A protein has these predicted regions:
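Terminal accessory carbohydrate-recognition/targeting modules of carbohydrate-active enzymes
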Residues: 1-267, 297, 319, 331, ...
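Short helix-capping and inter-helix turn/linker motifs at the boundaries of alpha-helical repeat units
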Residues: 124, 270, 287, 299-304
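Aromatic-rich carbohydrate-recognition surfaces in CAZymes
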Residues: 138-139, 160-163, 234-236, 300, ...
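Non-catalytic, well-ordered alpha-helical scaffold segments
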Residues: 145, 273-277, 357
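Active-site-adjacent bridging/hinge elements
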Residues: 209-216, 276-289, 329-339
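Conserved oxyanion/phosphate-binding beta-strand-loop segments in alpha/beta enzyme cores
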Residues: 260-296
């Protein structure tokens, strides 16, 4: 039984569904964050948000959303939802939602007439790639799906205004297209497991509003560019996988990649498992180093917070190896500062005077959980 499940009555009531946000991360710094009805309510929301090392490792929204449309008998049924200037909600795709479930991955079930369509999203671990699997559960006639990618290519705390400086070239690749709107950004690759038709139809969509930013009294309106749309016919019982990432992938590998990733997920069948999933999303791996983020989408890696939260974020959920990796990275930065006075490029606040005390406290929790002998053998040389 799923611990996180919302029915139609809650989903179509925006007063109840819009405040509920979800976060997916890849433990490499990238994330996907939006509401459970896929309507972005903060400028930091997006389908694919990645850190860019060449830009100071700050987060950048690459793909804001992917708007789906179901076509039957030539009639379109739009599943997307956005808030535009003046508080106008369009195209009100939430009215087709029948259920939202998040046992292993977020899954939204839509019903449009005789069509039942499910959408499941999953982030690939340690890779800047998100996969979305669409499955046509039921249909009584020929069905086609249309997808409009809404591109941003901006820093997560900034907003985009319609301009003529963007690169409008959208070259086609294997089962998809790629885009790089501005100089200095990596290329975004959008591909499908099935061969789609691509129609280049570029337009600026103006006046997106982010209600959470409006409530905070900060800038909240932007314009986003849509280069065109994909169309893919789909049959009853068939699944189509969409991939958005910073590298090209073989379309044939998408189904295998999806199944491999979902097998590693912890099912949210209890409150404890929900907490485990939540804290593991704050792990950050960078080559041989490992960090603990203070949170998304604003959190950084802070030295004091790392030492304070580390036992609860690792030992409490039986992740001893992750404790040791994160502690090793943090102690290395702390020792380097104490010897040279140099600040760490990734861990902020390493120069605070109480960091050594919190580090020792975290090691004491490690000793309590395992043994003083093991803790001494592993860490005594670091604290002398």
């Amino acid at each position: 039984m799923s611990y996180l499940k919302f029915d139609k009555n809650l989903m179509i009531n925006l007063e109840q569904s819009l405040p509920k946000e979800m976060l997916r991360t890849n433990q490499a710094g990238a994330y996907h964050c939006t509401t459970i009805v896929d309507c972005n309510t903060r400028k930091q929301h997006g389908l694919l948000v990645v850190p860019i090392p060449e830009m100071g490792n700050s987060w950048h929204v690459m793909l804001s959303s992917l708007d789906e449309t179901v076509y039957q008998h030539g009639a379109p049924f739009n599943l997307g939802l956005h808030r535009y200037s003046g508080g106008v909600m369009s195209p009100n795709g939430h009215k087709y939602i029948r259920e939202f479930d998040c046992e292993s991955v977020p899954r939204t079930t839509y019903r449009v007439g005789g069509v039942i369509l499910t959408k499941e999203k999953i982030f690939i671990s340690n890779e800047n790639r998100i996969l979305i699997r669409y499955t046509l559960v039921e249909a009584h006639s020929a069905t086609t799906l249309r997808f409009r990618p809404v591109l941003a290519f901006r820093e997560a705390n900034e907003l985009c205004i319609a301009n003529d400086t963007l690169n409008t070239e959208i070259p086609e690749i294997d089962n998809g297209v790629s885009a790089c709107l501005y100089k200095g950004y990596p290329r975004l690759f959008m591909q499908f497991s099935h061969k789609p038709s691509w129609t280049y139809d570029p337009h600026w969509y103006n006046g997106f509003e982010y209600v959470k930013d409006l409530e905070r009294g900060v800038p909240y309106t932007e314009d986003l560019w849509v280069p065109g749309y994909f169309e893919v016919p789909i049959k009853k019982g068939e699944s189509i996988i969409f991939s958005a990432g910073l590298s090209e992938v073989s379309p044939r590998s998408l189904a295998r990649m999806y199944e491999k990733e979902i097998a590693q997920r912890t099912c949210r069948t209890s409150f404890f498992n929900c907490l485990k999933n939540a804290v593991k999303q704050c792990y950050l791996k960078d080559h041989e180093s490992m960090y603990l983020l203070s949170g998304y989408p604003w959190g950084k890696t802070l030295a004091r917070n790392t030492f304070m939260a580390l036992p609860g974020a690792t030992i409490a959920i039986n992740h001893r190896e992750d404790f040791e990796k994160i502690m090793s990275t943090a102690l290395k930065a702390l020792r380097n500062f104490m010897k040279t006075g140099e600040l760490d490029r990734r861990i902020m606040g390493i120069d605070l005077p109480d960091n050594p005390l919190w580090a020792v406290w975290a090691l004491q929790q490690y000793a309590k959980a395992y043994s003083r002998e093991e803790a001494s053998a592993k860490y005594l040389s670091d604290i002398r």
